[in-house]
Swiss-Prot record:
It comes from Xenopus laevis. Residues 1-15 form the signal peptide. InterPro entries: DUF3456 (IPR021852). This is Protein canopy homolog 3. Belongs to the canopy family. Residues 226-243 have a biased composition (Basic and acidic residues). One of its GO terms (cellular component) is endoplasmic reticulum. The keyword ATP-binding does not apply. Its main location: endoplasmic reticulum. The keyword Disulfide bond applies. It is found in: Endoplasmic reticulum. Residues 27-236 form the Saposin B-type domain. Pfam families: DUF3456.
Amino acid sequence: MWFLFLLLPLWAGCAEPGDSEWVHLPSKCEVCKYVALELKSSFDETSRTRELIDTRYGFLEDDKKKKKIKYTTSDIRLIEVTEGLCSRLLEYNLHKERTGSNRFAKGMSETFQTLHHLVHKGVKVVMDIPYELWNETSAEVADMKKQCDVMMENYEEVIEDWYRNHQDEDLSEFLCARHVLKGQDQSCLSEQGDSRKGDTGPSTGTKKQKKQGEKKNKSKKQNSGSKEEKKQMDQPMAAKEEL
């Protein structure tokens, strides 16, 4: 049995928020950057439907005259997107091997991928935190979610204005540069995303389905081949019976 002892500050949850050596809380720029990114993503996910919303309730004569409106321009879509927006930030992890705002990304960090692989190979990894807490939300990500809640409340009208009148403009520029970070540090907005990707979780099953499909095709070919051979063998037997 191999032993690996690590006393590295890999998990921010072990330290107090005031300990700068362990915890580097997200800046206002970083929070706004990922809030805008998740807003874009969520609006994009809900933009593909052609659903119509019926606004006629039939209680008043004026209500009967109202027409159906598109879901993509409705208040319902805006509410659904913004309501659970900050919870999406909890899908992020802290990647301490990266710099700048790229330290926040979805998927497992390279450091923890390596540690998990060592554990799966039978190496006993001893750290200052138990194995069960390796995948817990870090203090930085928890704080980003907290700041997001406040930001969404304070800039609700700005987001609504973009949704109704400025969807042709970049959301990061409109929300962060012009409003949230006006006159403040905006350097993180221009940082390019890290091309490295973490372990995003379990397989989607595509490869497995592909293999199963290949097996089915192979089985079909074998069955068709055996049927053909049987047919060829039956023909001489039938000829003998006729004789």
